[in-house]
Curated annotation (Swiss-Prot):
It catalyses: Hydrolysis of (1->4)-beta-linkages between N-acetylmuramic acid and N-acetyl-D-glucosamine residues in a peptidoglycan and between N-acetyl-D-glucosamine residues in chitodextrins. SUPFAM superfamilies: Lysozyme-like (SSF53955). Lysozyme C is capable of both hydrolysis and transglycosylation; it also shows a slight esterase activity. It acts rapidly on both peptide-substituted and unsubstituted peptidoglycan, and slowly on chitin oligosaccharides. This is Lysozyme C. Gene3D superfamilies: 1.10.530.10. Residues 1-129 form the C-type lysozyme domain. PANTHER family: LYSOZYME C. It comes from Syrmaticus soemmerringii.
């Protein structure tokens, strides 16, 4: 599923991401835009053999099990395929673990490069939330 900006903001808010660990909803919507272009089915292979999955491009080396990443830690205790679900519940629940892990949203390269230090509130502006 490819979400609309406000549609995703509403879904993320409903799932408790607004101000989770101090990150406003705009941060999450911005991260999703630049990680997956709001597409829940996005997958991208990395040079180390791991793969990033779903709307927040969660990595199989650390966070989920895809059955083909050597030494996968699966810290979210889920199959990576769950991260491709159109309802985003698994992605959001795993993202909460990731952002609580010590590096905050810096765990997402796209957030660090494209969202951090910008006016992320623009990502939720005009949305009925």
């Amino acid at each position: 599923k490819v979400y609309g900006r406000c549609e995703l903001a509403a879904a993320m808010k409903r799932l408790g991401l607004d101000n989770f660990r101090g990150y406003s909803l705009g941060n999450w919507v911005c991260a999703a835009k630049f990680e997956s272009n709001f597409n829940t089915h996005a997958t991208n292979r990395n040079t180390d053999g791991s793969t990033d999955y779903g709307i927040l491009q969660i990595n199989s080396r650390w966070w989920c099990n895809d059955g083909r990443t050597p030494g996968s830690r699966n810290l979210c205790n889920i199959p990576c395929s769950a991260l491709l679900s159109s309802d985003t519940i698994a992605s959001v629940n795993c993202a909460k673990k990731i952002v609580s892990d010590g590096n905050g949203m810096n765990a997402w390269v796209a957030w660090r490069k494209r969202c951090k230090g910008t006016d992320v509130n623009a990502w939720t502006r005009g949305c009925r939330l």
